[in-house]
């Protein structure tokens, strides 16, 4: 609670909004998210070039999420009073270094090391992005500034997979990461030029954030968050081999499918507020239920290209409700400890991404093409049941 008050005090103390810094933060977030998901659309050529299976190559997503999980939990304890401006610059440098390491990787180990650097930057930056934004604009402008940040995330999610697939077919997967490194350099330059000094707190009163899990319905909510994101990554990480081998899409066709998925996600995010105004619980239970049915449809009729393409669109629309819905749940049910709850949420999501991609890859290599879909669908169904039975939503006052 003390940290929330402190953040509000800082926001109130800003005389004018620093929009250049806000957009610099948004650009960094967009680049981090884009690079995080690039392997999804480049999995097959990466695996072939490095002489590994697609399931093993998918662990490049796993290690990023795993490192990001720990980074989001412990970054504030590690950096303590360090000026946040220097920390953000460091994260932008790590983004650039990660892309270059992946681009020049001649072994699976170096690939994982590069992706681990990305995870460090991703988790730390994502955990700090909201508080950074609140210190760059007056209190009355904070919602608008935050919308810029989350808008950048939506755009990154739209373009990452299809752009990677398209460029990978033209210039090769290594040059795609070289291009991403250039974007990282732009992040460094923009942050250096626009971000003001943002001193850290000289001291903190230590509180156990995990005590929040003892509140009624909170543990169930975190379990549901874990299962929904694990289910998403169990399937989405391996969408390329599934769609190319099950439905017979070529690279161009897959690019269109991924683009459709991204656009659907953007549309779903844009209209999510209308659904959430009606019922947060219905959205949090209904979206994973629809995803479970979509996974079942792909298992049964996924060899039909039209069906597979339509399911990709439905999947994008439905899953868009999930992250927005759970953020809304935190602001409703954990409003007094929203910052700490958000830190736990980021860690849970990254752990879920790690486990989902890891188990999905193992299933793909050992149990066949449909196994990631079955795993994803099962987790989504369990999510819907947990939300319906155990998760509590505080009504909007």
Curated annotation (Swiss-Prot):
Periplasmic side: 43-54, 107, 169-175, 237-255, 303-305, 365-366
Pfam families assigned to the protein according to its UniProt record, in alphabetical order: MFS_1
Membrane topology of the entry: Multi-pass membrane protein
Positions of transmembrane segments: 22-42, 55-75, 86-106, 108-128, 148-168, 176-196, 216-236, 256-276, 282-302, 306-326, 344-364, 367-387
Gene Ontology CC entries for this record: plasma membrane
GO molecular function, one term: purine nucleoside transmembrane transporter activity
Matches recorded under PROSITE patterns: MFS
Cellular localisation: Cell inner membrane
Membrane-side (Cytoplasmic) residue stretches: 1-21, 76-85, 129-147, 197-215, 277-281, 327-343, 388-397
Domain of life: Bacteria
Gene3D superfamilies, per the entry: MFS general substrate transporter like domains
Keyword Transmembrane: yes
Family named by the database record: Belongs to the major facilitator superfamily. DHA1 family. NepI (TC 2.A.1.2.26) subfamily.
Summary of the function given for this chain in its UniProt record: Involved in the efflux of purine ribonucleosides, such as inosine and guanosine.
Protein name: Purine ribonucleoside efflux pump NepI
Source species: Salmonella paratyphi B (strain ATCC BAA-1250 / SPB7)
Gene name, Swiss-Prot/TrEMBL: nepI
